[in-house]
């Protein structure tokens, strides 16, 4: 038989359908129906949402992100219960930096088959949306039979009044930088972590905090913005660490000097640096080192801002000051 001759499925007794090819449509439909019990709006061809009232010139702000190789830790631990919250956090924390309130979230999950792990991921996504105060408007769960591992992406849209957009233009020399505590690694630097795991330098059983979900800063940011208009800039500390993310909220001609001794770096980062023999500057460029989000405020609002942040249950420190670039 030539390589391009068709197989005789009838002779072999094969009735080819999607399930035989590896995609179970019925299981997928059942999965969607279960999701509808907690998120009634999903399942249509497109999600719809009404623009909230009270805006004169509403601006929509959108962002997309993923969780990177943190998914590999989920596989090692066989625990997918928190990674959905990470996905929401990575998107929401970006969108709120300009002062936007999260409005809705969409997800994309690619999997070999719809199983309990996918259900756990979705539960985490719904929990993340609840914390962020946004609607889960829809998404796509794609079955790829030849795919070995899971992959996922998230998409978030927020809304802000045009005149209240925070773009860093109000930042001036002498303004202070407040660092908000992270819950751990969040969702960055896991390629180094996975390398250390494969080289048996660290073990997940000794460090379950590797799966601690990323902090969602939307509630505390909303509180700060509701309290007044003195938040001049905000930055989500992700890949690139403070050195590459904090400057993104500063106007041209200004820089921030950060005191890395202003807070205590969590032990997990010290362990990674020690076991991997990672250079100190590389640690700063890869990991958040305990600071997951930054806000820039005038010096006379420093203490008030920090009091509000702590009142919301998040620790914080004055970690830097704004100067003119030399």
Segments (PLM) and residue ranges:
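Glycine-/charge-enriched secondary-structure boundary and capping motifs
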Residues: 2-9, 13-20, 31, 117-135, ...
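N-terminal glycine-rich phosphate/pyrophosphate-binding loops that anchor nucleotide-derived ligands
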Residues: 3-96, 133-137, 172, 177, ...
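Glycine-rich, charged/polar anion/phosphate-binding loops
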Residues: 44-47, 138-143, 160-166, 217-221, ...
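Glycine-rich anion-binding loops of enzyme active sites
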Residues: 49-54, 59, 67-68, 86-87, ...
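Glycine-rich phosphate-binding segment of PLP-dependent enzymes
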Residues: 55, 197-198
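Short, flexible active-site-proximal loops enriched in glycine and acidic residues
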Residues: 93-105, 282
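Short loop/turn motifs at secondary-structure junctions
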Residues: 99-101, 192, 230, 315
């Amino acid at each position: 038989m030539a390589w391009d001759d068709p197989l005789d499925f009838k002779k072999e007794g094969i009735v080819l359908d999607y399930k035989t090819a590896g995609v179970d449509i019925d299981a997928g439909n059942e999965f969607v129906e279960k999701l509808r019990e907690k998120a009634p709006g999903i399942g249509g061809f497109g999600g719809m949402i009404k623009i909230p009232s009270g805006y004169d010139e509403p601006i929509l702000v959108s962002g997309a992100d993923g969780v990177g190789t943190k998914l590999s830790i989920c596989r090692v631990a066989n625990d997918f219960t928190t990674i959905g919250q990470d996905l929401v956090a990575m998107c929401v924390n970006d969108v709120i930096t300009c002062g936007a309130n999260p409005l809705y979230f969409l997800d994309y999950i690619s999997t070999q088959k719809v199983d309990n792990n996918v259900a756990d991921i979705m539960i985490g996504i719904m929990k993340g949306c609840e914390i962020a105060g946004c609607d889960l408007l829809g998404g796509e769960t794609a079955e790829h039979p030849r795919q070995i591992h899971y992959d996922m992406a998230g998409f978030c849209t927020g809304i802000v009044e045009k005149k209240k957009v925070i773009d860093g233009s109000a930042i001036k020399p002498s303004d202070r930088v407040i660092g908000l505590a992270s819950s751990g690694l969040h969702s960055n630097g896991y390629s180094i972590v996975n390398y250390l795991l494969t080289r048996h330098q660290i073990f997940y059983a000794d460090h379950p905090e590797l799966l601690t979900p990323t902090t969602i800063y939307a509630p505390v940011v909303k509180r700060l913005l509701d309290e007044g208009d003195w938040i001049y800039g905000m930055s989500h500390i992700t890949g690139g660490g403070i050195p590459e993310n904090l400057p993104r909220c500063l106007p041209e001609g200004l820089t921030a000097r950060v005191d890395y001794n202003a807070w205590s770096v969590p032990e997990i980062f010290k362990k990674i640096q020690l076991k991997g023999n990672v250079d100190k500057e590389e640690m700063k460029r890869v990991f958040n080192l305990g600071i997951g989000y930054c806000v820039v405020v005038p010096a006379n609002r420093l203490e008030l801002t920090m009091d509000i942040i702590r009142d919301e249950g998040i620790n914080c420190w004055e970690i830097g000051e704004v100067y003119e670039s030399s």
